[in-house]
Amino acid sequence: MSTEPLPSVPAPSDFIREIVAGHVAEKRYAKIVTRFPPEPNGYLHIGHAKSICLNFGLARENNGQCNLRFDDTNPVKEDLEYVESITADVQWLIAGWAEHCLAFKPKGAHPARITSNSQPDYYLGPVAPAALTTEPFFASDYFDQLYEYALTLIRKGQAYVCDLTPEETEKYRGAPDQPGQESPFRHRSVAENLDLFQRMKAGEFPNGARSLRSKIDMTSPNMWLRDPLLYRIRHVTHHHAGDKWCIYPLYDYAHCLSDYLEGVTHSVCTLEFVDHRALYDWVLTSLDLPRTLPHQYEFAKLTPGYTLVSKRKLLTLVNEKVVTGWDDPRLPTLSGLRRRGIPASALRRFVTSVGVTKFDSLTDIAVFEHAVRDELNQVALRRLAVLQPIKLVLTNLAPDEVIECDATNNPQSETPTTRRVALTREVFIEADDFAEVPPPKFFRLKPGGEVRLKYACIIKCDELVKDATGRLTEIRCTADLTTRAGGPNVARKVKGTLHWVSASACIEAEVRLYDRLFTVPEPAAEEDFLKVINPQSLTVVTAKLEASLAEASANERYQFERLGYFALETKTAEPGRLIFNRTISLKDTWAK
């Protein structure tokens, strides 16, 4: 992994970047340090891409670093599977753009203890490139330090062990329009609290029997300050820490201290954590930590139309087998988008175009699709493919005649290259490119009509062949070979141009035509989102492809001319069986 800074590029402008720019100008921090801290309890989705791009973008633009840290404080819901998936997704999204800013856990795994003013401090700070390993940060690596900090809060009279059940705790909490009640255990002595907390750690009590709570203000209008829990008992094996612990810190307690330990300067999160900021600050200031404290900033999350980003609802889609798994190309998960063939650069472009604001709103999915089309138009190799083939016979070509035609690989390239495609007596065209009784302004093939076969020549429809049931089986045409490239009549114009493949020089492949999963822009607003599933979100066809696609690469993207953009499917493909996934159609078929 390169640690060389990339060339300076103009950064988008938004309120968070303006704040950071001000801090850089006044030299408030030696280095800008951000973090992306997912909980490993699910797969990342398109909404997370905004946070990834913002946090890594801030580091990239300011020669800083961004830590990938797993906030793994709830072992009940977390799993190594998600750690591996999230790590792969993040590295895919930032590859070639900001991977030099990605900081991994330093060698030695744990921060060294520093003592200042008799208070424990385990500050880790920014990571030097030479110290990088390939393992991400884990909040669970700080459990020893977090436990010591909790003891400090108890000694200062700012935390206590509470025996209320979870249900009683919620009842005592009150409501937004009425104050909470103090726990009857709130005024235990420091000595008793220390003893009970240490016994909690030793595993003497069952799940839910006791918790450690902060002592703040049960009458606060901010519900998050009504003596929130700091630790709870969970006799569960942890995916990373094993069986060492049976007490686990709550997110709001662990998160701010993990930021501090890693030297994070700007803790950027979504608007749902606005009310949590007061607790974030309370924990840090209550411990009298000697080094510069991180600060939390909030921005609006990304919610695209025609999709869902709720983990619970995405899980329903998986469990109900509406989709094939978390990486189904119809899902907004990053693994699903990647499998569908979405370029990481297109996703970054989309996130940049949406911007960073303080107001939640629904983002038109067409904006995302436009970014994908624009990106793929620049990089995709053009190829010929026919999804719904019907045979067309060029009667003036000999049965074994082969005419080599030059086809452009990518007209958008600064130095376009070509390949050879074979024109033979029998070819396939799309069934809907022919109409025996054409509607008005139909410029494709019809009886007596002419069209151009792209890269080849103009043909004229002379005769139709049907079977005993009246089904069309063959279209017989004449090829005007004088209209080929280099021919005397190459400039002759016709209104329609069709794609095609040679019947004798083509290959068969399965093609999966993916579309939007929902029929309405806001499926989350529906009473039952399963009732607005698009029944045509996946259509599978056996297509005829030009022979060169037998050597297709998973690293390439392809435009099947006049059809859309496609990527090679690798997960379910088998030797000798090609599968292509449609990434996106050439045009927005949903536009009104």
Residue ranges and their predicted role:
Residues 2-182, 245, 272-296, 301-306, ...:
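N-terminal Rossmann-like or analogous alpha/beta NTP/dinucleotide-binding catalytic cores
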Residues 74, 80, 110-114, 126-127, ...:
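Active-site cores that bind ATP or allylic diphosphates and position pyrophosphate for catalysis
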Residues 34-41, 66-73, 260-268, 328-334, ...:
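Glycine- and acidic
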Residues 29-30, 99, 159, 206, ...:
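Intrinsically disordered or highly flexible coil/loop and linker segments, enriched in small
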Residues 292-371, 375:
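Long, charged, mostly alpha-helical binding arms that flank functional sites
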Residues 273-277, 281-283, 345-348, 352-355, ...:
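Core subunits and conserved enzymes of cellular information-processing
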Residues 83-92, 149-155, 174, 343, ...:
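Charge-rich, well-structured scaffold segments of protease-associated domains
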